Amino acid sequence: MFEQEQQDAVRVVEEFLKQAKLKKGDLVVIGCSTSEIASHRIGSYSNADLGEAVFLAMQGAFAKEEISIATQCCEHLNRALIIERKDAERFGYEEVNVVPQPKAGGSFSTAAWKHMQEPVAVEHIQAKGGIDIGDTLIGMHLRAVAVPVRIEQMDLNREKS
């Protein structure tokens, strides 16, 4: 299930990495609305299975390049971020006490919490790059100067409802 979305997610990461000029150990923030992937209004159609499928595909693609990731939760958790503890410590980010759920944090960040080795939530980061799937507004978690990149893969196999 969701094979097309996984393939598309890997293509997004590959195209992004070709343009973004990141190095091993850099941090990327990912915001992802499963509602938007499924052609619904953001926040209205959270899908845990879709979030998990897309997260695992993207996590694997970034891991191959040794790029660290953080996932942005939704506004119910004040857009907190889920990140590996080792990365939070390496970058000096302060941990906050929240745990994402599909309808409070988002399905994508819930999957991150489930599949990261030692996940923690942090309030803010300054990532070197970011991918925003579904207009989740990740800009607050990027460095002050960020250059947008345009990729060919614009959608993750949008279903029609």
Can you say where each PLM-predicted feature lies in the sequence?
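N-terminal glycine-/serine-/threonine-rich phosphate-binding loop
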Residues: 1-28, 48-61
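Non-transmembrane, aqueous-exposed alpha-helical and coiled segments at domain scale
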Residues: 10, 24-27, 35-45, 57-99
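A generic local secondary-structure boundary/capping motif
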Residues: 19, 59, 100, 146-153
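Generic, ordered loop/turn and secondary-structure boundary motif
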Residues: 23, 38, 43-46, 132, ...
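General beta-strand structural signal in soluble alpha/beta enzymes
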Residues: 30, 69-73, 121-125
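Low-complexity, flexible helical/coil segments
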Residues: 62-69, 105-110, 161
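A glycine-rich helix N-cap at a beta->alpha junction
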Residues: 91-118
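Glycine-rich, aromatic-bearing surface loops/beta-hairpins
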Residues: 110, 114-161
